[in-house]
Amino acid sequence: MSEPAVVSILDTDLYKLTMLQAVLEHYPDAQVSYKYTNRSPKMALNQEAYNWLREQIRGLRNLHLLPEEEQWLRKNCPYLKESFYEFMHEFEFDPENSISLNYDSETKDLSIFIHGLWKNTIFYEIPLLALVSESYFKFVDKDWSPEGQFEKAYEKGKRLIRAGCAFTDFGTRRRRDPHTQEIVLQGLMKAQEDFKGPGSFLGTSNVYFAAKYNLNVSGTVAHEWYMGIAAITQNYKQANRIASLKWVQTFGTSLLIALTDTFSTDVFLKSFTANSADDLANVFHGVRQDSGCAEEYIEKVVKHYKSIGVDPSTKVIVHSDALNVDRCIELYKYCEKCGIKSAFGIGTNLTSDFQKVSNPSEVSKPMNIVIKLFSAEGTKAVKISDDIMKNTGDRDAVIQAKHQLCLPIA
């Protein structure tokens, strides 16, 4: 067998751990499924890449939470409860029974379907996406080099810090390989060491690298949480509120950044109220913007906070949609002008930003791949988002959800 590319069960995003905690508390017996989609279909695996991917996925069964990893989590993630560790002591990946993996050697279509108990399958998404990306750039597109990645990351960090941006690495899922992500983090750490404010490198969403380099680990919540609850309850009008309340019940005053666009931000804000029984707008520290026009989003959120008597200057918008350094700086300035704090979760632009070796003036394009919740408790799951191109799920289920929410179908 080839060397494992994923060497730790913690080589994933923090929100997978926190969502597992919430699932254990609220939906321990829920059955779910997930589906892989390649939004860059011309970037397809060859047979060699698929063979390597299949072997790597099988190897996930060898990963377990190590004692030193548990020790680090207990110290640095106090919001994870004893029930989380009790579960993790027994947990192991079971790819043979949880994953349907198929590859058509003629069309080069790759199919990945994950199924099982939510608590047993929630950890697959991030390593599988990282492995698909790595397999493509290991065996199909080899016209790139890690040379210069440290310097590139250092320069990005310098510009962001000098501009006032507070930012985090969100790049695990679409990285070229783990080595690239590690080099990038080293470059960002060096920039943080060399340049003092007004911005700052806040750390990474990757738990393994946070532990390895003693970085802050950060994360919000994924669309998966809202999508799953909406499918389970079949109540799209109340899904955001139910999901938010259960999140608060689980974590209290920690990890309170709300993701607003699962069923559109307009729908979310209807249940994001203040001075009511829920008081969610006061309780949550801020919101995350992940689709649509960011400037319109900033204005909308600031206006909403003001309309319900919440001072927007006490809140933060975490931007995470297709960011690069220039875009972060633009949005930082726009948030500042509108009177709200900002932070940035930068993914692909950090861990898959390359030029072609054969023609350095040409970009080596990253893959655009996702794994999304497909169903929960037998009901199709959907994501509507603030961008029509980011709608996810069975078309009939999307139409049904939009009818419930009084959203335009087209």
Curated annotation (Swiss-Prot):
InterPro entries per the UniProt record, alphabetical: N/Namide_PRibTrfase (IPR041525), NAPRTase_N (IPR040727), Nic_PRibTrfase (IPR006406), Nic_PRibTrfase-Fam (IPR007229), Nicotinate_pribotase-like_C (IPR036068)
Cleavable signal peptide: none
Top EC class of this enzyme: ligase
Modified residues (Phosphohistidine): H223
List of residues binding nicotinate: Y15, F170, T220
Pathway: Cofactor biosynthesis; NAD(+) biosynthesis; nicotinate D-ribonucleotide from nicotinate: step 1/1
Keywords: Ligase, Magnesium, Manganese, Metal-binding, Phosphoprotein, Pyridine nucleotide biosynthesis, Transferase
Binding site for 5-phospho-alpha-D-ribose 1-diphosphate: T348
Record carries keyword RNA-binding: no
Membrane spanning stretches: none
Cofactor note as given: Activity is highest with Mn(2+).
Single biological process term from Gene Ontology: NAD biosynthetic process via the salvage pathway
One MF annotation (Gene Ontology) recorded for this entry: transferase activity
Post-translational modification: Transiently phosphorylated on a His residue during the reaction cycle. Phosphorylation strongly increases the affinity for substrates and increases the rate of nicotinate D-ribonucleotide production. Dephosphorylation regenerates the low-affinity form of the enzyme, leading to product release.
UniProt EC number: 6.3.4.21
A GO CC annotation given for this chain: cytosol
Cofactor entry: Mg(2+); Mn(2+)
Catalytic reaction(s) noted: nicotinate + 5-phospho-alpha-D-ribose 1-diphosphate + ATP + H2O = nicotinate beta-D-ribonucleotide + ADP + phosphate + diphosphate
Pfam families according to UniProt: NAPRTase (PF04095), NAPRTase_N (PF17767)
General function of this protein: Catalyzes the first step in the biosynthesis of NAD from nicotinic acid, the ATP-dependent synthesis of beta-nicotinate D-ribonucleotide from nicotinate and 5-phospho-D-ribose 1-phosphate. Helps prevent cellular oxidative stress via its role in NAD biosynthesis.
Family per similarity comment: Belongs to the NAPRTase family.
NCBIfam families on file: NAPRTase, PRK05321.1
Protein name: Probable nicotinate phosphoribosyltransferase
Organism of this sequence: Schizosaccharomyces pombe (strain 972 / ATCC 24843) (Fission yeast)
Lineage of the species this protein comes from: Eukaryota, Fungi, Dikarya, Ascomycota, Taphrinomycotina
